[in-house]
Amino acid sequence: NIDLEILKKTKSFCLIHSKEINHPVGSSLNKRVLKSLGKADFVIANSKFTKELGLKLGLKDIHVINPGCNYPIVVSETAREFSKNIYGNASPKLITVSRLDGRKSHQNILMSIKNLLPKFPNLKYVSIGDGDERKNLQKLRKELGLEKNVELIFNSTEQEKVGLLEQSDVFVMPSVVYKKSVEGFGITYIEA
């Protein structure tokens, strides 16, 4: 049996990441979310950006606690060799780790790579992740003639991912508002 008196005294926390509160004002989903958040004793946003979204919706007293990540993984020799085989003697070495969806702006990265090649002909860009944009990005890579300079890895082990991150010079992750979707605080920024 649950003691209802204890439950009534228990403080409730609600963590918001931006996507779940970024619904049209006045929509039924917006009203339900605001009602639920209004019942929480503490509302915690994962970023200042998300806090601002919440304040615009009328939420009050939002606290910001940025997410963390696990301690760095010790990279195995196998993973180091894997990443050396991918990057070779490239310079600079760029990387993105994320889902392949519109709000991540991968198509803009590929177009930027194309524009950077005259100045950096040995550039290598690695994208690790999979998603709805997979076929579009494969097609765009081919259309732009980037097969030699762009590696799309759709499935990798954690060791391979960390090995590639360790070998890279620049972590690339633009974020755009895509329809009503926005990246509030990408965890991969911290992992990189």
Residues of each region from the PLM?
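A short, histidine- and acid-enriched strand-loop-helix "catalytic/donor-clamping" loop
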Residues: 12-27, 39-42
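Acidic anion/phosphate-binding donor-loop and adjacent secondary structure
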Residues: 21-27, 55, 69-85
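Nucleotide-activated donor-binding/catalytic signature segment of Leloir-type glycosyltransferases, i.e.
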Residues: 37, 91, 126-128, 135-162, ...
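Conserved donor-binding/catalytic core segment of Leloir-type glycosyltransferases
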Residues: 44, 86-104, 110-113, 171
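Carbohydrate-associated surface elements
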Residues: 49, 68
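Nucleotide-sugar donor-binding and catalytic loop/hinge architecture
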Residues: 77-93, 119, 145
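Short donor-sugar binding/catalytic loops of nucleotide-sugar-dependent glycosyltransferases
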Residues: 97-102, 116, 131, 156
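Acidic donor-binding loop of glycosyltransferase active sites
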Residues: 166-182
